[in-house]
Structures are given as C-alpha cells and as structure tokens.
C-alpha cells in the first residue's frame, strides 16, 4: 500500500466489495436436479457460510460483534456479520450482540451462553459500522439439464480495513465457474491539513488483488469508472473438466458424442451467465 496517509480524525471512507459466484452442474433429470440442489444446499448451509465469513473477518483484521444466520425452506441460506475494526471493551458492546458465540461455530462457550444461544432460531454477525453478508440461490429448470448455484457476498467496511485482501480466499472457498466482482469507495476523509481524500489506496483494477495463478484459470474482463471510484471485474473459467460438472454420473459411462454435447451446453450456459444475456436462449438441449 506504500506510505500511510496521515489523516485527521476517523477514516470515513466506506469500501464495499460485492462478490458473486456461480457454480454450474449437469443433472439430466428433474430428480437429479432436485438431488443436486439438496446436496449443494447442505454443502453450503448457514453453518459453513458462517465459518467462511468469520475467516474473512479475521483476514481483514476485524472483530465480530454479532452474527445472525438462517437456513431457508426449501433451499438457500443467509448469514450477516457485524464487525468492528478494533476490539471493544465488553461494557461498550450492546447486549443484543452475541460476539459470534453460538454453539455450532464457537465450541469454547460456557453453559450459560450455550443455554441462551440455543434458544435462538437465527444468529447474525455484525461489525462496528461495517458488515459482511452472504446469501445463496440454488436454481434449476425442468426443461434444462443444467442446474446452477449462486453465492452473493457483500463486505462493507469503514476505516482502514480493506475488503479486497480476501478475494483469493473467497474464490477458493467455492466452486467458482463464473465470478462477478464489484468494488466501490464512497464518502471522504481528510488529511491533517483539511484536504479532502476520496480514496486512500492505489487501485486501477480489482485484478491487482487477485493472485496470478488464480487469474490464469479464468478469462477476465474489466469495466471501471475511475472518476466515480467504481471497479468491476468478470471472470469465466477457461477449462471444463467434465467429470467435475456431472452429478451422480461417471464421465466414462457416457459416449464421446454425449460428452461433447454436455460440455458444449455447459459452456453456453456459462457464457450466458457471464454475459448477462440470453445469447443461445433455449435452442440447445442436452436431453
């Protein structure tokens, strides 16, 4: 980051990172699609998502004030974490904050805490003026043999904490076939002499904060509006290892032509999601 800026008072800049990933899977029948949705829903339930967000909080050097989480019927999950840049004395923390202490995430709690927390149907994590949230969206259609799973993660911070440093961890935490990342900086802070600062770090692309070995696996496109401190990066996986996209099916059970057809359909689905447009519409089929 280079030399640190000398600021007057608190750093009032708000830095928001929106991270969206898509996992694509081939499931031929409606039954297989439902089984896939059930499987992925269990794999990325609120417990696992909470652990991921707590790790994100740790990586940005923040402290958890409160955690809330919820699994939904028939599928999907949400977790919200409120965080603080600095550890706060217990007397300053609102009594409604659970500090992330609930039985399935933090086993080192006393019996009184466990009794209180066991009565809660949901748990949320919050930061002081900053927060981390995650939501999941499984999806399929009976007329299409491809099911998708979307994860939306938002990290909003104030002060010196930067959410960009957790990108590699987030990408590796999910089966990320398509990734959309948005980063924006809002507000202003001041230098000691009163000069307004609308940005406190150097950036010309979100790619600056993603490891080269990660970028090498994707086709990457940037759309940035520097004057507005808006940065946008889209990533599309380059190689498709078909076995990794088949649900309850071995690739060697399929004839070569079928493998090519499925791979083609997967690629078309990914391109449409990446482009945000119905390029191929429903003119292709893998049934």
Predicted regions and their residues:
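Polybasic/polar functional segments that serve as interface/processing modules
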Residues: 1-287
């Amino acid at each position: 980051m280079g030399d640190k800026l000398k600021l007057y008072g608190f750093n009032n800049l708000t830095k928001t990172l929106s991270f969206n990933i898509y996992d694509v899977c081939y499931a031929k029948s409606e039954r297989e699609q439902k089984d896939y949705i059930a499987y992925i829903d269990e794999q990325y339930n609120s417990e696992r998502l909470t652990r991921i967000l707590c790790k994100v909080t740790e990586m940005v050097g923040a402290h958890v004030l409160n955690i809330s989480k919820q699994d939904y019927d028939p599928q999907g999950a949400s977790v919200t974490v409120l965080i603080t840049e600095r550890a706060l004395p217990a007397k300053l923390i609102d009594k409604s904050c659970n500090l992330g202490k609930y039985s399935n995430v933090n086993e080192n709690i006393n019996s009184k805490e466990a009794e209180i927390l066991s009565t809660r149907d949901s748990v949320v994590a919050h930061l002081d003026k900053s927060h981390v949230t995650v939501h999941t969206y499984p999806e399929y259609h009976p007329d299409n043999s491809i099911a998708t799973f979307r994860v939306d993660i938002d990290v909003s911070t104030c002060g010196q904490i930067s959410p960009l440093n957790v990108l590699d961890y987030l990408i590796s935490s999910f089966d990320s076939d398509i990734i959309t990342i948005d980063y924006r900086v809002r507000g202003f802070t001041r230098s000691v002499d009163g000069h307004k600062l609308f940005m406190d770090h150097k950036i010309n692309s979100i790619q600056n904060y993603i490891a080269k070995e990660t970028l090498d696996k994707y086709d990457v496109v940037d759309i940035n509006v520097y004057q507005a401190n808006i940065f946008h990066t889209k990533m599309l996986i380059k190689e498709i290892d078909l076995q990794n996209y088949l649900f309850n099916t071995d690739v060697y059970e399929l004839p070569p032509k079928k493998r090519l057809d499925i791979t083609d359909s997967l690629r078309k689905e990914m391109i449409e999601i990446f482009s945000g447009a119905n390029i191929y519409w429903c003119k292709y089929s893998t049934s």
